[in-house]
Amino acid sequence: MQRARPPADILPSEFFLHWVPEAVATDAERQAKLADTRATVVFDLSGPDGGFYTVLIDQGRVEGREGAAEDPDLCVHLDVATWRRLNRGETSAPEAALKRKLRFEGNFLLGLKLHLILG
C-alpha cells in the first residue's frame, strides 16, 4: 500500500505540527515500527518559510512542536527547497546528503528511521 504524500505546497509548519502526527496516528504499521522508539528530532529548515521544528517520538506516538528542543537526539539540517523535493519524492535523503543539501547531527541511526515517521 502506497503511503499518502503531503500536498506539494504544504508549509513546513503545517507539515510538522499537523500532517506528520496525523499521518502516524492513522497508520498502524508506522506506529508498530516506532513502538520501541523514544526520541526528540529537531529539523532546522533554512530559507523562506523555514524555521525550527521539533518532532517528539514516544512509543508509536508522534507530536510536532514549533521551535528547537534543547539537547535533541538528532538534528536534521536542510533548506526548504530540499525539504520540498524530499517530500515530493524528487530526491532521496542519501542523494541530498551526498550533495551536502542534508546534514544529520546526533544519532545517525535514528536518521535512518526518519522515513518511518515522515513517509
Kindly give the residue locations of the regions a language model identified.
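Feature captures hydrophobic
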Residues: M1-G119
